[in-house]
Swiss-Prot record:
GO terms for biological process: gluconeogenesis; glucose 6-phosphate metabolic process; glycolytic process. Homodimer. Pathway: Carbohydrate degradation; glycolysis; D-glyceraldehyde 3-phosphate and glycerone phosphate from D-glucose: step 2/4. The gene is pgi-1. This is Glucose-6-phosphate isomerase. InterPro entries: G6P_Isomerase, G6P_Isomerase_C, Phosphoglucose_isomerase_CS, SIS_dom_sf, SIS_PGI_1, SIS_PGI_2. GO terms for molecular function: carbohydrate derivative binding; glucose-6-phosphate isomerase activity; monosaccharide binding. CDD domains: SIS_PGI_1, SIS_PGI_2.
Amino acid sequence: MAPANTLSAWSDLQSHHSKVGKTFVLKDAFKSDPERFSKFARTFTLPADISSDSPNATDILFDFSKNLVTEETLDKLVRLAEEAGVEKKRDAMFAGEKINFTEDRAVYHVALRNVSNQEMKVDGVDVMNTKGGVNEVLQHMKEFSEQVRSGEWKGYTGKKLTNIINIGIGGSDLGPVMVTEALKHYGAKDMTLRFVSNVDGTHIAEALAASDPETTLFLIASKTFTTAETITNANTAKSWFLEKTGGQGDITKHFVALSTNEAEVTKFGIDAKNMFGFESWVGGRYSVWSAIGLSVALYVGYENFHKFLAGAHAMDNHFRTAPLKENIPVLGGILSVWYSNFYNAQTHLIAPFDQYLHRFPAYLQQLSMESNGKSITSDGSAAKYTTGPIVFGEPCTNAQHSFFQLVHQGTKLIPADFILAAKSHNPISNNLHQKMLASNYLAQAEALMVGKTAEEVRAEGNVPEHLVPHKVFLGNRPTTSILVGGHIGPAELGALIVYYEHLTFTEGAIWDINSFDQWGVELGKVLAKKILKEIDEPGAGSGHDASTGGLLGAFKKYADF
């Protein structure tokens, strides 16, 4: 496809922004159009059979009305998506075509949550029902998770395994961490879950210090089983286990692999029957739906894991079939492009008003920034426009007492997403906490929109004139409010994640970049291997710049290995 800035819709949007966007005032738009909310809000409904509030369905309301757009703006943004081939690229992904063009791979994580079991093929092979395919792996996960949870699968001394340590990094860590935290309400009360990702020895040391080898199960999550950080931590865990058990511990009962490299897995000592595989068309940041989600199934139970997949599948179907103007992830994506490329916004705030979602911004950070942190378009030329935004966030109301100052009164435009569930899993104090949370969720979006003028500050009385400008809020700051109509359960969480997945897809499709590779993580890893050897050799290494050489020498001096 053509670079985004060569499309006629792009030029049209530039003119439109100059004429309308620069002078658009949100609060005036609401005053002039009482129907603005209904015109710009969209509702996604989860079926009752997977809803956390079954037998009732769950609505998820996406309010786009507090964004800096008119109906004309939205039409022009939809036309940009059409010209950029978003629908064609979407259909190619769902058809198993190799849209990851730099690695010649399909992008088929949607198959992992294909709970309706529609036929899905890559290179003519049905990935759902082939040997080692999606359904076989899911069945293996179901059987294993139920055996561990029931106590049928025991440790080497016959005790139930209640301490789960997942060792992985990147997508093999961020997804499971986020999901198990988000679904903590559904977690097994007799189970402790720990995640080790960092090669910093502190991470594995602290996890092991709090563990009993007789009741600990290790999940080693690495597709290739060669990821440096993961295998280093896995070997440390193995040594600890054998030392603590006096060499009597049975590795096959306490270690399983989420991997496809049988040779390395069995060499490590894990029984090949305890391998849970996934294909090359599963990118790391999309792998929580795969065998990498085994920790989720163990913690919340396979039935809830299946609902998690089903909620994701429901949003997949919406994205695949809804017209662009009614397509909720597409709307989120084109709004992101609008702010990034026409308002020069560099960041995007994710603020969940839900403590269980405290790792959601970090998860979305990887999803967005690893996908769209690219500067080269499909023809190999440099993009002549901004691509992926910097995604950040923290749960509210905590965030209101840290960086919200900058969001309200800083010099940068920061589009924000606010997320709230109407019902709390912990409705304590007669729902007082939930009411306070909701009031802040509503108030922050309103405050960012309406602001406060100098006249309004003066009208409050007793404000010295020299303080008036400091108490002014410019307002006109855009937000998208997402309201889950019930609790955030497995299906609701699945749908929310997939909303952001396909929003990210839409951005990348418009920017004409490959959202599915991650070459940017490679260079540092290559250099680290060289430097690791040099740390054990005399001198300050070779071939480095003066700064790196100087730092290496200083480190070796101070570390005194």
